[in-house]
Amino acid sequence: MFGYVTLYRKGLADAEMDRYQAYYCGLCRTLGRRYGRTGQLALSYDMAFVAILLTALYDTPTAFSEGRCVPHPLKKRPRADNELLDYAADMTAALAYYNFLDDWQDDHRRASLAQAQKLEPSLPALRERWPRQLQTMAVQLDRLNALESAGSHDLDALCNAFGALLGEVFAYRDDIWAPALRGMGNGLGAFIYLMDAYDDLEKDSRRGQFNALQQLADELPPAAYEQRCHELLTQQMGRCAQQFEMLPILKDTPEGKLLYNTIYSGVWSKYALVRKHREAKRHD
């Protein structure tokens, strides 16, 4: 479901892209160090965004360096290392475990079961380190699975379940910034859930699988459906942006530039691609 919280690359200078790459590569290395190859398989732009956001908010000391890795053995790449990349790696591993388990339960993919089993020994330590976040993950994913299994098309309930999950991930500490971070994560989580449904509509329809937007697609003409989806996505990103603006993050800092780019431009990149592809197919 992750992979929608990306940059608008044309809006950034080379130095800013290097800074982003440092966090992304840093998260990959941290996942490898803490969870091995299975953890690295779950690497996402979304959790790199969480690390950048929290680093900027808490002004966390960060070590930057360069180095080679197995996927990129020839050219050195920028790397970042700090405690919030450790946190993002922990959240990535926990979410990956539940995702692999869900894939196994839904489709009986043996590869997914094997990956879940590799991460399972890490769960007790994760629950001990982050009890609030892990408890919320379990509760909200159970809630989401129950809604989807029942064939619910209550978009508010579906979006709120995933939004509450991501909101708790954003709330690194239970401090003065936690309400804004939770609100931001709620809006972004709802956007991600809707965007995933929007992206997968045709595939889910072919396979006879649940899709939160299927009823809307069945009830509305194509143009009205597209307009309504855009309205829903805009509403959720508006909630996210409103809460983001309450945080003391300066737009002209290196991390601030990446965050503003992502929230106001980058998240719409995949939407634009999916909509363009769908409209092209419609006119073939």
PLM regions with names:
Residues 1-183, 190, 194-234, 238, ...:
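Acidic catalytic motifs of isoprenoid enzymes
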